[in-house]
């Protein structure tokens, strides 16, 4: 169960970083359209 738990935490951090990058891209696009 320890290895599966480790993979779970890894996928969690990966999804979190992905969502953060998506939010950044959305913010950039918003500022571009506003400009």
From Swiss-Prot:
Stretches for region Disordered: 1-35
Gene Ontology CC terms: nucleosome; nucleus
GO biological process: cell differentiation; spermatogenesis
Any GO molecular function: DNA binding
Skewed-composition ranges (Basic residues): 1-17, 25-35
Keywords, ordered alphabetically: Chromosome, Developmental protein, Differentiation, DNA-binding, Nucleosome core, Nucleus, Spermatogenesis
Subcellular location: Nucleus; Chromosome
Tissue: Sperm.
Protein role: Involved in nuclear basic protein transition: histones are replaced by spermatid specific proteins which are themselves replaced by protamines in late spermatids.
Name this polypeptide is given: Sperm-specific protein Phi-1
């Amino acid at each position: 169960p320890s290895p599966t738990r480790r993979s779970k935490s890894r996928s969690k951090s990966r999804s979190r970083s992905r969502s953060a990058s998506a939010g950044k891209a959305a913010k950039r696009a918003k500022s571009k359209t506003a400009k």
